[in-house]
A protein has these predicted regions:
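Active-site alpha-helix of zinc metalloproteases
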Residues: 90-94
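A structural motif
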Residues: 133-140, 170-176
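Post-HEXXH active-site segment of zinc metalloproteases
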Residues: 108-118
Length: 217
């Protein structure tokens, strides 16, 4: 089965064009596969390929939209005068590129992702943005990528939702491959314990996260 990205773009035409570019990019699709080989087959950790990308992209997009509905202003809107559609594109593209550095090595992969993501982001954004917005969007994407490291501070809402979305990809199916291979670690055990993760509109806060546990692990 061919690798494809599916994102709930709604009326965001920029995201629709981006997803088309991504699904036609053989190099990026292969980087996802290479990253997953290093993660699952060689590293014994949970899936970090196309399934992870799809989950993170859609989760980040949903949280961003809920935050905007709740009156939170994305960084690219506040600081660069761009629009919500641009912020949405940033989180989707950052999700698609944040783990490609694992194709090099899991350790310090955020920084490896940066040097792979810079030319790839600009390539994927051709026809969607012109300068100076092309460089602005690329810069925001790179910040979100490096800031998904637990030790890095997120300076934008876009980076923050990517970081949270990445952490929320922890349901039971994510750990199936390493767990069945007998590779029991924090990634497989924690994921085996989580039945579902739901992102909902909050009552007091813009976003509510509902995590259902299913295993005493």
């Amino acid at each position: 089965m061919s690798t494809k990205l599916f994102v709930l773009a709604k009326k965001n035409r920029k995201i629709k064009r981006l997803v088309q570019h991504i699904n036609e990019d053989a190099e990026l699709l292969q980087l996802w596969k290479c990253a997953n080989v290093n993660a699952v087959d060689r590293g014994g950790i949970s899936d970090h390929g196309e399934i992870h990308i799809r989950i993170v992209a859609n989760a980040a997009l949903k949280m961003l939209r809920l935050l905007v509905q709740g009156g939170v202003e994305p960084g690219v809107v506040k600081n660069h005068g761009l629009e919500q559609d641009d912020a949405e594109l940033i989180v989707v593209l950052a999700a698609c590129l944040h783990d490609i550095g694992i194709a090099v090595h899991r350790a310090h992969h955020e920084r490896y992702s940066l040097f792979l993501a810079y030319p790839k982001a600009r390539e994927l954004l051709k026809g969607i943005y012109e300068e100076p917005d092309l460089t602005t969007i690329t810069s925001e994407v790179l910040h979100a990528i490096v800031a998904h490291n637990a030790k890095e501070i997120c300076l934008t809402i876009e980076a923050g939702v990517l970081k949270v979305a990445d952490a929320l990809d922890m349901t039971e199916g994510r750990s199936r491959i390493p767990f069945e291979k007998g590779r029991v670690n924090i990634h497989s055990i924690s994921a085996q314990a989580v039945d579902s993760v739901d992102i909902e509109k909050g009552e007091k806060k813009p976003v509510k996260l509902v995590i259902t546990l299913a295993n005493s692990a």
